[in-house]
Amino acid sequence: MESEKKNYCFKYLKIVMAVLLAAALFYSGMKDYVKVGKTDIAVVELYGDYPAVNLAKQIWENYQCSDEITDFCFVWNGGVQVVTNPENFRQTNARVTGVVGMAALYDRQAALLEENDETGCVIDKDTALELFGSENCAGSQLTVGEQIYEVRGVVSWNQHTMLIRPSQKNQVCTQVLIRGKKGQNLEGAASDFLVGNGLSGILAVSYTHLRAHETLANL
């Protein structure tokens, strides 16, 4: 009888320990998840031989095939351009920005733009309202010069902005965003990336990636 009681207590103790271990692992995982959103990112201003879009894409593809995990995003600054709704010819001015690599480093909401989507775009709410009269315009088309884009999503940015995946291979990237690895300072992360890819640049600023597009717009 006493032996059965001991076995029961032992089994109960094992269950309790398993539950506590699972809870501890869950809590640890949640802490790591939360930290991802607060990770500092280096904004590097490139100079010298600016990498063209095709080179930026090649660098990104090379990293995807390697064992080294590095999160980065090249940025092409298209400046303020006229954006048009081809159906009713409504127009507005918007800052056009192209990204190559992990778009979410530019802004979390930029993840709406898939990696190889060269015909899609993400725009801010004000641009959507001025062009389409509504924020619910996903799937609608707009033009910039002779280029036609389809709206993939509308996001909350504080200025007229249009985000794309640049398709013209000769366009050059003037910035790169780099997320430092755990325990690595941003200067080291920027230096390693630049040297490893034969690029020249200077660390301009670092920021918490929740406000990425605002920081870049003010540079």
Predicted features and spans:
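Conserved small/polar residues in nucleotide/adenosyl-binding loops
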Residues: 208-215
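Hydrophobic secretory-pathway targeting helix
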Residues: 2-36
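A residue-level structural signature of the nucleotidyltransferase/glycosyltransferase Rossmann-like core
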Residues: 119-120, 141
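The feature marks short, hydrophobic/small-residue-biased sequence motifs that occur predominantly
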Residues: 73-115
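Mid-to-C-terminal secondary-structure elements
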Residues: 100-109, 125-182, 187-190, 194-199
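Extracytoplasmic/periplasmic regions of membrane proteins
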Residues: 40-45, 50-53, 98, 108-111, ...
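Membrane-proximal extracellular/periplasmic loop immediately following the first transmembrane helix
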Residues: 28-82
